[in-house]
From Swiss-Prot:
It is found in: Cell inner membrane. Keywords: Cell inner membrane, Cell membrane, Membrane, Transmembrane, Transmembrane helix. This is UPF0716 protein FxsA. It is a multi-pass membrane protein. The gene is fxsA. One of its GO terms (cellular component) is plasma membrane. InterPro entries: FxsA (IPR007313). Belongs to the UPF0716 (FxsA) family.
Amino acid sequence: MRWLPLLLIFLLAYIEISIFIKVAAVLGVAVTLLLVVFSSCVGISLVRNQGMKTFVQMQQKLAAGESPAAEMVKSVSLVLAGFLLLIPGFFTDFLGLLLLLPPVQKSLTLKLMPHLSVYRPGGWTGGDAANGNTFDGEF
């Protein structure tokens, strides 16, 4: 179990290199490198645009007194998508673009919502002070 993260990193590197070699064999190395750079740029601009929309929606929910938990899950998926799109390679770009799709974000939201709770500072309510008894003391 301790070796699982390291194994996943090596597996990801193997998949990325294999796909890169196959694409480069078909399209050529220069075109393949341009595709990797282009997909990263397009992905980052998509994440930036969707991130601003999500931020505005989160502010609107907070202003209306509603829970922004769904927007929080969406923002986490956007951050993860942005990270995956920054990693050079076609497989991680595919995973990052997959996380940008609204149906995938909705299914992630439905799976993660039961595990989220939004904390709002509101002070204490109730307790012994509510019945009028006050105790003075020194520390």
